[in-house]
UniProtKB/Swiss-Prot annotation:
<keyword id="KW-0851">Voltage-gated channel</keyword>
<keyword id="KW-0472">Membrane</keyword>
<feature type="modified residue" description="Phosphoserine">
    <location>
        <position position="608"/>
    </location>
</feature>
<dbReference type="GO" id="GO:0001508">
    <property type="term" value="P:action potential"/>
</dbReference>
<feature type="topological domain" description="Extracellular">
    <location>
        <begin position="389"/>
        <end position="395"/>
    </location>
</feature>
<dbReference type="GO" id="GO:0071805">
    <property type="term" value="P:potassium ion transmembrane transport"/>
</dbReference>
<dbReference type="Pfam" id="PF03521">
    <property type="entry name" value="Kv2channel"/>
</dbReference>
<dbReference type="GO" id="GO:0051260">
    <property type="term" value="P:protein homooligomerization"/>
</dbReference>
<dbReference type="Pfam" id="PF02214">
    <property type="entry name" value="BTB_2"/>
</dbReference>
<comment type="similarity">
    <text>Belongs to the potassium channel family. B (Shab) (TC 1.A.1.2) subfamily. Kv2.2/KCNB2 sub-subfamily.</text>
</comment>
<dbReference type="GO" id="GO:0005251">
    <property type="term" value="F:delayed rectifier potassium channel activity"/>
</dbReference>
<dbReference type="GO" id="GO:0015459">
    <property type="term" value="F:potassium channel regulator activity"/>
</dbReference>
<feature type="glycosylation site" description="N-linked (GlcNAc...) asparagine">
    <location>
        <position position="287"/>
    </location>
</feature>
<feature type="region of interest" description="Disordered">
    <location>
        <begin position="804"/>
        <end position="861"/>
    </location>
</feature>
<feature type="compositionally biased region" description="Polar residues">
    <location>
        <begin position="523"/>
        <end position="534"/>
    </location>
</feature>
<feature type="transmembrane region" description="Helical; Voltage-sensor; Name=Segment S4">
    <location>
        <begin position="297"/>
        <end position="317"/>
    </location>
</feature>
<feature type="modified residue" description="Phosphoserine">
    <location>
        <position position="448"/>
    </location>
</feature>
Length: 911
């Protein structure tokens, strides 16, 4: 949605495969251009203010504003569209309505139709704690959640028991597992279901045969006159016992845990169902004599009665019977209480009825134990009528016994019934859960669906997660109030967030540090440790270079070399430190920000947006002040005005320099070293010394990316040295000043100055945005300044060097810097020299222009030299020794000579 498609690629192509991710400056610009943001949740669009989302900074939406890279955005949202300022979340749209209202009103409610666990998952996703639910929704939410958590806990225990059936430590584990599933899990396969049906049929057949053997018509008399089983029914019973025996042995052999198998209640029932048959056979066959048979006969009858326990084998295949057994086991407290009540009632009422009826003739209440039977059937409201009281007192006792029996039995019975109902539902739910889990596992093996682990999905919902995590590591460097990350609405910060807080470049920091790195990869890795919105321009350029190296389309540079072939240059980033200065301050005009970019594929435009030097314009702080920047240049070259009007595009520069040491300065005009690098896409041009080579002494590594870029850029970087001598102030400029503030420059000598000039290229006919109005004036001895007196901006006395790279799309030549010498009558003037020095195997033109002053008492203006000449003609006017051009960064009007009081015509210069 938010991609930039390179040339030659289809715009409909997927961003993740062929196109570059959006640049961080594009993301920053998209967020700062509007006070509102569009949030698309499951196809439902919402529009909300950024400051509303800032109320909960530690939530997912609160972190959205701080994500200024493609990777960090995709960690927070699922997709985004920078053109529409829209962010997409593939979540439940209904639940998000309640969550968004929490940002707006501070009240969190759960909708009636929402599932409790589903709403809890949404709260976890958006980073909001469930404890902030209002009281009207908390009871319903927590009740449903606890119920579901209990069911999930039971299911987890069941699954743990099933997962504990390990066959790895035994022989033939695969075959034994298949046999175990066939006998113990009827729903595992069709064969297991058939086997379970056959087992049920044998149980029913065995029960029917046992019942028919008791019929006299089907019995046979033995030699002792005792009835025996029918031979045909005996064969049927033998077959059934053989099946039960085989089934029991196979279960025992395939069981993963033999001792656990023996302790199982269903397995004990199976053993009791087959054991009496074998005991009976053993006793009858070992005692053939009449005397021995008579002694064993009663024992055999007991075991024959135990065969009726075969009917309990149906519990293996019936959930209801299993529930009944588990209910009796779980309700032993209630059953014990019921028996205790009955026993106490029987004892009391049997004693009362005995003393009431003992005087009657032919009474059946002969003793208290004989009265137990009457009390039992009376309290259970059965009343057989075989024994009853006859006296009035006995009848009253019988009535009280009936009432007490109803009350005693009615109290614990509902508890037992409720336990049975709950356990039965739980058994059915577990069966369905097991089926669902097995179906998911099969689907996972087939690759048709993603397996979901319910225990992991709802593990976090069982705990109260507080998202109020305090920031670490920021309190040491932050003055003022820390960021309130608590979710309580009473602690929200309702103050409007300043635009400077969201800018990509913080220009009002109190401390700066110097970073020096030689490897771009190392610098790129270091950027990941800091917040994306604090990336410097050089780091953003490194990031962009790393991205472009991976692309199949490389942009050739003017000398036909690829980006990868360029040698790595020593890069150093110098940042400044704020120093307190008692000097007076100069009001600096508001600067204008870069409001539009024609192309973001250029490195220069990329860094110009990233550094964002218009912080003073948007900041709520008062505008800082700066002293005058004083520059000394020789007189202007002829034809400067015509050339500048023909070459209107402004400059873009990215400065990398080392800080020089400081030495004592004399009250003289200080020399300035300027190295000019011109790299153009057009044909070569010649200067006064003939055509210049296109190779540059210190070529920027980003220049290879500009070969086919329509965006034209020029860059100038100048370091200055000053003189300690006094000089009158330069009047403040009414033109657009450089985006430099007093906070960016130290006002004492040993501090390093690094000025970055970033500007967008306008159309060919537009005037340069960076420039100053330059005037010529006569001698100004005794001149009274028109503006209030202010102190000069002082620089270190040592010579400072820098590069100036001017890239255009019209020419490919190097332009030449020339300076003129002051008349020899000026004793304190410095020579203007021109030298050529090779660097890195190439021969760039390095020019050193030195400027002098007429006298120590003369006005020391901030002069500026013509940087380059026109394309068609190059004029030199060495006779203009009495007039000097000023690099008027902050003043539009300059007097030509110290003694003049008039003004020369306005001349516009560009850096």
């Amino acid at each position: 949605m938010a991609e930039k498609v390179p040339p030659g690629l289809n715009r409909k192509t997927s961003r993740s495969t062929l196109s570059l991710p959006p640049e961080p400056v594009d993301i920053i610009r998209s967020k700062t251009c509007s006070r509102r943001v569009k949030i698309n949740v499951g196809g439902l669009n919402h529009e909300v203010l950024w400051r509303t989302l800032d109320r909960l900074p530690r939530t997912r939406l609160g972190k959205l504003r701080d994500c200024n890279t493609h990777e960090s955005l995709l960690e927070v949202c699922d997709d985004y569209n920078l053109n529409e300022n829209e962010y997409f979340f593939d979540r439940h749209p209904g639940a998000f309505t309640s969550i968004l209202n929490f940002y707006r009103t501070g009240k969190l409610h759960m909708m009636e139709e929402m599932c409790a666990l589903s709403f809890g998952q949404e709260l976890d996703y958006w980073g909001i704690d469930e404890i902030y639910l209002e009281s009207c929704c908390q009871a319903r939410y927590h009740q449903k959640k606890e119920q579901m958590n209990e069911e999930l806990r039971r299911e987890a225990e069941t699954m743990r028991e099933r997962e504990g059936e390990e066959f790895d430590n035994t022989c033939c584990p695969e075959k034994r597992k298949k046999l175990w599933d066939l006998l113990e899990k009827p729903n595992s396969s069709v064969a297991a279901k058939i086997l379970a049906i056959v087992s049920i049929l044998f149980i029913v057949l065995s029960t029917i045969a046992l019942s028919l053997n008791t019929l006299p018509e089907l019995q046979e008399m033995d030699e002792f006159g005792q009835p025996n089983d029918n031979p045909q029914l005996a064969h049927v019973e033998a077959v059934c016992i053989a099946w039960f025996t085989m089934e029991y042995l196979l279960r025992f052999l395939s069981s993963p845990n033999k001792w656990k198998f023996f302790k199982g209640p269903l397995n004990v029932i199976d053993l009791l169902a087959i054991l009496p048959y074998y005991v009976t056979i053993f006793l009858t066959e070992s005692n053939k004599s009449v005397l021995q048979f008579q002694n064993v006969r009663r024992v055999v009858q007991i075991f024959r009665i135990m065969r009726i326990l075969r009917i309990l084998k149906l519990a293996r295949h019936s959930t209801g019977l299993q529930s009944l057994g588990f209910t009796l086991r779980r309700s032993y407290n209630e059953l014990g209480l019921l028996i205790l009540f009955l026993a106490m009632g029987i004892m009391i009422f049997s004693s009362l009825v005995f003393f009431a009826e003992k005087d009657e003739d032919a009474t059946k209440f002969t003793s208290i134990p004989a009265s137990f039977w009457w009390a039992t059937i009376t309290m259970t409201t059965v009343g057989y009528g075989d024994i009853y009281p006859k006296t009035l007192l006995g009848k009253i006792v019988g009535g009280l016994c009936c009432i007490a029996g109803v009350l005693v039995i009615a109290l614990p019975i509902p508890i037992i019934v409720n336990n049975f109902s709950e356990f039965y539902k739980e058994q059915k739910r577990q069966e369905k859960a097991i089926k669902r889990r097995e179906a998911l596992e099969r689907a996972k093996r087939n690759g048709s669906i993603v397996s979901m682990n319910l225990k992991d999905a709802f593990a976090r919902s069982m705990e109260l997660i507080d998202v109020a995590v305090e920031k670490t590591g920021e309190s040491a460097n932050t003055k003022g109030s820390t960021d309130d990350n608590h979710l309580s609405p009473s602690r929200w910060k309702w103050a409007r967030k300043a635009l400077s807080e969201t800018s990509s470049n913080k220009s009002y920091e109190n401390k700066y540090q110097e970073v020096s790195q030689k490897d771009s990869h190392e610098q790129l890795n270091n950027t990941s440790s800091s917040s994306p919105q604090h990336l410097s321009a050089q780091k953003l350029e490194m990031l962009y270079n790393e991205i472009t190296k991976t692309q199949p389309h490389s942009h050739p540079n003017p000398d036909g070399q690829e980006q990868a072939e360029r040698p790595s240059t020593y890069e150093e980033e110098i940042e400044m430190e704020e120093v307190v200065c008692p000097q007076e301050q100069l009001a600096v005009a508001q600067t204008e920000g870069v409001v539009d970019m024609k192309s973001t594929s250029s490195i220069d435009s990329f860094t110009s947006c990233a550094t964002d030097f218009t912080e003073t314009e948007r900041s709520p702080l008062p505008p800082p002040s700066a002293s005058h920047l004083q520059m000394k240049f020789p007189p202007d070259l002829a034809g400067l005005e015509e050339h500048q009007r023909a070459r209107a595009p402004p400059f873009l520069a990215l400065i990398r320099q080392k800080g020089p040491t400081v030495r004592e300065a004399t009250p003289e005009y200080a020399p300035i070293d300027i190295t000019v690098n011109l790299d153009a896409a057009g044909g070569p041009q010649g200067g006064p010394h003939g055509p210049l080579p296109t190779d540059c002494a210190s070529e920027s590594p980003k220049s290879s990316l500009k070969g086919s870029n329509p965006l034209k850029s020029r860059s100038l970087k100048v370091n200055f040295k000053d003189s300690r001598g006094g000089a009158p102030p330069t009047p403040p400029s009414t033109a657009r000043p450089l985006p430099v503030t007093a906070a960016d420059f130290p006002l004492t000598a040993p501090q390093l100055i690094s000025t970055i000039l970033l500007e967008e290229t306008p159309s060919q006919g537009d005037r340069p945005l960076l420039g100053a109005e330059v005037h010529c004036q006569g001698p100004s001895k005794g001149l009274t300044p028109r503006f209030p007196k202010q102190k000069l901006f002082t620089f270190s006395a040592r010579e400072r060097r820098s590069f100036t790279e001017i890239d255009t799309g019209e020419d490919d030549d190097f332009l030449e810097l020339q300076g003129t010498r002051r008349p020899d009558k000026q004793a304190d003037s410095s020579p203007n020299c021109l030298t050529d020095k090779p660097s890195d195997g190439r021969d760039p033109l390095r020019e050193e222009a030195c400027v002098g002053s007429s006298s120590a008492q003369d006005t020391s203006h901030n002069c500026r030299q013509g940087i380059y000449h026109g394309v068609a003609e190059v004029k030199k006017d060495n006779s203009q020794e009495g007039c000097k051009m000023e690099n008027h960064l902050f003043a539009p009007e300059i007097h030509s000579n110290p003694g003049d009081t008039g003004y020369c015509p306005t001349r516009e210069t560009s850096m």
